[in-house]
């Protein structure tokens, strides 16, 4: 996949960078009903339960039961579902993306850090026939141009497990996505040191694509990481009050009968 990178070592930010280091907090409704002034919320409304979370993953139903996708927070699929919700709604501080740990793709389910949101899940062909599926990582809500400083890292291994051979792919490559550079005529953001971001696919879409040849028993692995990049020139007080919401959708679109 274009722009894929392997995990980098974790670093720490120094106090000398505090000038560009602003704190963003979520809205906290008080018991009295008074709403504290918000800075930034990074959340997604759960499509199933109406609760808040970091993001929601959903599989679109396919009428033929021979073609089925299930989701799980582990590759054992002991409790397969069609909707997953990361329930984190946490305070975060903008950070240098170089500070992210290198094991983000090694922990299942929700594994948020102090200054980032991370969620790992699996997608399995639980039907009886081979098919293709589309995936789309959507920005379903955004205000105050907060997306100009948000970064989304996607670890995506379409054939993490291949049922036919029984082989697992543990490499864990990733791509970092960002909105094109402000005033850059479509040029990508470049974060220190020389970390070139991949532009969002389009307005409202981080990335999308199609996976072909997904056979019964095959498993895909996905890790989504969200943070606010403190090195971005757009990471200013102008973002105060912004909201950001992600959904990831999967849909069966091609079968061996097509």
Give the predicted meaning of each segment:
Residues 1-100, 109-110, 244, 249, ...:
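Short, polar/proline-rich extracytoplasmic segments that appear immediately after membrane translocation
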Residues 5-10, 51-55, 63-67, 74-80, ...:
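Generic structural motif recognizing short loop/turn segments at the entrances and edges of beta-strands
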Residues 14-16, 23, 56, 74, ...:
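Residue-identity detector for threonine
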Residues 17-32, 96-106, 110, 163-219, ...:
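Extracellular adhesion/glycan-binding regions together with long Ser/Thr-
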Residues 20-25, 29, 38-69, 109-185:
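Surface-exposed interaction patch
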Residues 99-133, 138-140, 196-258:
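C-terminal, structured domain-capping segment
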């Amino acid at each position: 996949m274009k722009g894929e990178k392997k995990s980098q070592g974790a670093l720490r930010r120094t106090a000398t960078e505090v000038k560009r280091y602003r704190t963003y907090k979520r809205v906290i409704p008080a018991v009295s009903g008074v709403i504290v002034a918000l800075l930034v919320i990074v959340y997604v409304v759960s499509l199933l339960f109406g609760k808040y979370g970091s993001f929601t993953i959903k599989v679109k139903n396919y009428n033929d039961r021979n073609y089925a996708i299930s989701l799980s927070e582990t590759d054992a699929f002991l409790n397969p579902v069609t909707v997953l919700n990361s329930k984190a709604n946490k305070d975060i501080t903008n950070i240098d993306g170089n500070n992210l740990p290198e094991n983000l793709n090694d922990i299942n389910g929700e594994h948020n850090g102090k200054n980032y949101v991370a969620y790992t899940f699996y997608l399995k062909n639980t039907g009886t026939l081979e098919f293709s599926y589309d995936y789309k990582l959507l920005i379903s809500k955004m205000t105050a141009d907060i997306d100009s400083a948000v970064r989304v890292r996607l670890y995506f291994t379409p054939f993490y497990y291949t049922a036919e051979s029984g082989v697992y792919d543990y490499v864990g490559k990733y791509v970092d996505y960002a909105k094109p550079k402000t005033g850059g005529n479509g040029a990508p953001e470049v974060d220190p040191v020389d970390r070139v971001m991949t532009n969002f696919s389009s307005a409202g879409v981080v990335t999308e694509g199609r996976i072909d040849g997904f056979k019964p028993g095959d498993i895909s692995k996905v890790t989504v990481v969200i943070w606010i990049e403190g090195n971005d020139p757009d990471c200013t007080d102008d973002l105060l009050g912004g909201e950001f919401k992600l959904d990831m959708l999967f849909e069966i679109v091609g079968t061996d009968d097509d």
